[in-house]
Amino acid sequence: LPSISFSADPTSQLINNNVTLSWSSSNANSCSASGSWSGTKTTAGTEIVQITGVGNNSFTLSCSGSGGNRSSTVTVEGYRETDGVVVDGYISGAEVCIDENSNFLCDSSEFSTTSDNDGKFKLRYVDGSLVSIGGTDLDSQIILENYLISHKMTGYTEFKVVTPVTSVASFLCTNNGTCDGSGANINTILGIDNSVDIYTFDPVANRGD
């Protein structure tokens, strides 16, 4: 039977970016691809492929020889990133994470980063709540030791804000957007115009509006 050595580098990649597939075989005279790639392949080689899907992207290589057929599959996990900004005045140097277990801490197993000098951050997206801890208020230059604000995410979007208002919504509102048991939304409760999306609205960038 043919034998196949088949690998992907890296095995986890941001979608719309590339990975390198490498393979070699013995006792084979032809190979073909299936799954997340396709076509006839040489019995040994490398190929750069784009990761297009979130979750598992499976690549299968099947090789044939006089002794029969053999297949091998490698899987690459595709993921997305979410951008955002921490605002109560922009907050730099805050630890920002996606809290997956709802303990309002940035555990070592959770994806985390530090907000930059404009309060901005970028994180690998998973389901959970954005939590910002500490940092420095860029308006007042006050160090916000252990200051915590959050944003309960209900799905993927490319940009999110973490503000005191999103923190209130995290505690008062359900995932369907109703709050405090009354069926009202957070905008109504806080007297904010319903045209404002509190989860993406940057209050500093829109001062005076």
List each model region and its residues.
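Proline-enriched interdomain boundary motifs that mark the N-terminal boundary
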Residues: 1-8
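Structural beta-strand segments of beta-rich domains
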Residues: 17-21, 82
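C-terminal edge beta-strand
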Residues: 70-78
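Feature for extracytoplasmic/surface-facing segments of secreted or surface-associated proteins
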Residues: 79-209
